[in-house]
């Protein structure tokens, strides 16, 4: 009897650990990635800071109550409730919606105003799901191997392919001038 009880307890523990792991990795496996970052615009074309996220999964994702943060936990933007991101769709989160839409009037969907900006040299961009679990994180810099042209010259940071490890600077390139918010990246290689 004790042995049966121990086996049942062990099975319950294993199943609960598996469920926890699935929940923890749910965001990572979901395919929602930080895909483009505008952290230091040129003086002549300044929509202010913005971040593009992309749904590379085959599922529609409910991003309601997800959080965008920089390296400071006090700097966060809650994505509005019922924000659905269909497969292959982009979402732009911008610091200043008026400045952003004045220069990119055709981009949709977008949300803002973030209430904080990104560091002009280096910073974190972090995305958390509605359970507070980290979904994606990029720690960019304005030094190699990160593309230096994205630092005030006009281009943005663009991920070469959404399946690449976006924590590595060599997987990012400087965009065409002003970036491609809400659209396929100008540097998209099509290669994983």
Q: Can you describe what each PLM-predicted range is?
A:
Residues 4-14:
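Sec-dependent N-terminal signal peptides
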Residues 17-192:
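Activation on beta-sandwich/Ig-like modules and their edge loops
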């Amino acid at each position: 009897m004790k042995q049966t009880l121990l086996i049942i307890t062990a099975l319950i523990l294993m199943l609960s650990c598996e469920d926890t792991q699935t929940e923890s990795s749910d965001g990572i496996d979901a395919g929602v990635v930080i895909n483009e970052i505008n952290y230091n615009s040129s003086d002549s074309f300044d929509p202010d800071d913005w971040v593009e996220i992309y749904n590379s999964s085959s599922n529609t994702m409910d991003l309601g109550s997800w959080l965008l943060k920089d390296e400071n936990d006090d700097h966060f933007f809650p994505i509005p409730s019922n924000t659905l991101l269909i497969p292959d769709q982009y979402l732009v989160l911008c610091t200043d919606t008026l400045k952003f839409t004045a220069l990119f009037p055709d981009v949709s969907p977008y949300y803002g105003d973030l209430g904080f900006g990104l560091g002009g040299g280096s910073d974190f961009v972090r995305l958390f799901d509605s359970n507070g679990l980290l979904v994606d994180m990029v720690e960019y810099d304005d030094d190699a191997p990160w593309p230096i042209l994205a630092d005030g010259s006009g281009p943005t940071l663009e991920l070469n392919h959404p399946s690449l490890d976006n924590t590595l600077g060599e997987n990012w390139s400087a965009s065409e001038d002003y970036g491609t918010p809400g659209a396929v990246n100008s540097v998209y290689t099509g290669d994983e």
